[in-house]
Amino acid sequence: MFTLPQKDFRAPTTCLGPTCMQDLGSSHGEDLEGECSRKLDQKLPELRGVGDPAMISSDTSYLSSRGRMIKWFWDSAEEGYRTYHMDEYDEDKNPSGIINLGTSENKLCFDLLSWRLSQRDMQRVEPSLLQYADWRGHLFLREEVAKFLSFYCKSPVPLRPENVVVLNGGASLFSALATVLCEAGEAFLIPTPYYGAITQHVCLYGNIRLAYVYLDSEVTGLDTRPFQLTVEKLEMALREAHSEGVKVKGLILISPQNPLGDVYSPEELQEYLVFAKRHRLHVIVDEVYMLSVFEKSVGYRSVLSLERLPDPQRTHVMWATSKDFGMSGLRFGTLYTENQDVATAVASLCRYHGLSGLVQYQMAQLLRDRDWINQVYLPENHARLKAAHTYVSEELRALGIPFLSRGAGFFIWVDLRKYLPKGTFEEEMLLWRRFLDNKVLLSFGKAFECKEPGWFRFVFSDQVHRLCLGMQRVQQVLAGKSQVAEDPRPSQSQEPSDQRR
């Protein structure tokens, strides 16, 4: 398999340098401003976080109010993803199809994973794997999960298998936790921008709301970085929710953060947990990217590494293989909580969100193979992630586009505000549609409830030829020259320099 070589990464010869940026921004901005003004009266569809589910409407008479809300999410929030799957790029069958730089998946290590999952020790069928199991998961798997998390989270004491529940993915974990922790209409605090699908996870079953903790790109006051979360901002958001009559039951934290890539320090984690204890709030900590920190200078620490949790009965940690092991299709996620009432309630919902016995066996085999993980998979995965991140970063710098440079996750938070003349979400949506029309799917800031229009998430964890082609199509849109770029590679070439016109 071709590994993205860092030394081969160069800015494309077709990139517009800094001297061109003023003209590029000006001509495109005037065009976008005119198009936006023509469409303002048409009321573009809006992607909302569920501040108030009652705002969602649908005309169908066949569905319950809950069903109408679920259908609304499918019709609106999934538009780009559905469009992509109807016109998916294939270098042989559909070279002018859509390049997906919007979905956060790791597509860099299929060769390593396919080899490991096809080994003989993965192939086992016995009666116990074909029958109903403990809804928390087979004991052999929960034991391996506890050992795995103890090692990689650097827990000061061994984690216990009785505190582990396994489900079919992180989405199910969010849904189950929200349902068992909150009454309908209650809320979780969540810093924004945040992984927008959490809105669906907590709302579609449990009708749980999200109370936003808005973060700013400007560094002000005591902040030391853009979009910094502080206890003061948490307190303010909590007061605002209470003033609106919303009961807040918990706080959702993501570390490494999606879409920012930020990693919370142990001191920050402790401050957030103390805040939550003070207000008797549950804390859901999503650490699904914990093994995808590819810069050695980034000092990642799991919440489970803390010597003492301020409120262990209200602290619930999530992890899954979908990101760190590039297995979003296998649907494996795990919850670690010391609260046995919560664990039992979530386990009961595993009747609807459980894993097959065969998948549980494979996951146990994978997680116990510490030699392969440490000596083969993680070093190579980190090297490929770093190389891909370097390439996209250099492309953005060549275009004079600001972005947050972090060393974790699969994405870069990109600032395209200068391409929005009036700085509106309508313009952001129009720019997103231009990207999609030019066959490149990105994620726009409103989908993450970013308060400032013009931010986009670029996913870089993909093969080099798709990254090159996707960035070429992005450049065409920003230059006001939208046209579908096809893969110009010779059939045997894999070098970035040979993939550009």
From Swiss-Prot:
Modification type N6-(pyridoxal phosphate)lysine: residues: K323
Pfam families according to UniProt: Aminotran_1_2 (PF00155)
Binding sites annotated in the UniProt record for substrate: E105
Keyword Chaperone: no
Polar residues biased stretches: 490-501
Keywords: Pyridoxal phosphate
Family: Belongs to the class-I pyridoxal-phosphate-dependent aminotransferase family.
Chain's role: Does not catalyze the synthesis of 1-aminocyclopropane-1-carboxylate but is capable of catalyzing the deamination of L-vinylglycine.
Name of the protein in its database record: 1-aminocyclopropane-1-carboxylate synthase-like protein 1
Species: Homo sapiens
